[in-house]
Amino acid sequence: ILESIEEKRLKFKRGNLNYTPTPKIGDKFIHVSGGIHHEDIIVNKYEFEMGNPFWNKAIENNDFKTYCSKYGYEGIDLVYVLLSWNGQYIPYNTNFDHHTIYAKKLMTQIHEAYPNAHITLLGIQICSVNGGIGANYGASGYYSDEFGTITTAFNYNKCLEELANSDEFKDYVRYVDTKAQFDSEYNMPMILKKVNTRSTITEYIGTNAVHPTLNGYLQIGDVFYRALVRDIVDGNKK
């Protein structure tokens, strides 16, 4: 499913129960529902961008040591991972087994390569609270339930916190809450619209469900920065 359009870049998300690594591309994208871009998009040619800088094709797996060697790093001391909104399409969801499988795999691989590395899991921010859900996904189907989607975000963050605090990972992993440090009301894309056809009063209406404005991304960056400062000051203590 085509999720968002940027200059010279299209971003896709997988549909329900679709875990294929790359989408099949035809010669045209036709608008079906949601979003603010309704025109057909003609595809002349395309290529896929490598999404994982740590992937080693030779071994078909993440390879952190080869990555460090390539860029002249002696090793890894601190790791900050934002486990994103991708795949959080079920309202009121409490089952994140598919996500935790890969989260555990990632953290274990890092720990095996660099046993002294300290990992910080960053939770996800709350989605748009003033219309962005409807702008992107309409009034039916996945993501359309705003309160249900917000509940899923809370439940997912709780899952990540419990994972970080579990016996398996608590010695080298911690959880940092992003949603408490993110302004979902004012740092999401929005436009001014009349409150109704008989009034000149305007209000801000969201135009994107889960992708922040630049200021919003910078605010998520602030969450990382605070975590980094704490690690430096406290010497990586949880």
What do these predicted ranges mean?
Residues 1-96, 101:
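Conserved SGNH/GDSL esterase-like catalytic core that processes O-acyl groups on lipids
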Residues 31, 77-82, 118-123, 174-177, ...:
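Structural recognition of the beta-strand scaffold that forms the well-ordered cores
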Residues 84, 108-115, 161, 165, ...:
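Sec-exported extracytoplasmic/periplasmic mature domains
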Residues 88-96, 128-137, 184-187:
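Extracytoplasmic/secreted cell-surface and envelope-processing proteins
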Residues 176-208:
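Mobile gating loops/cap/lid regions near enzyme active sites that modulate substrate access
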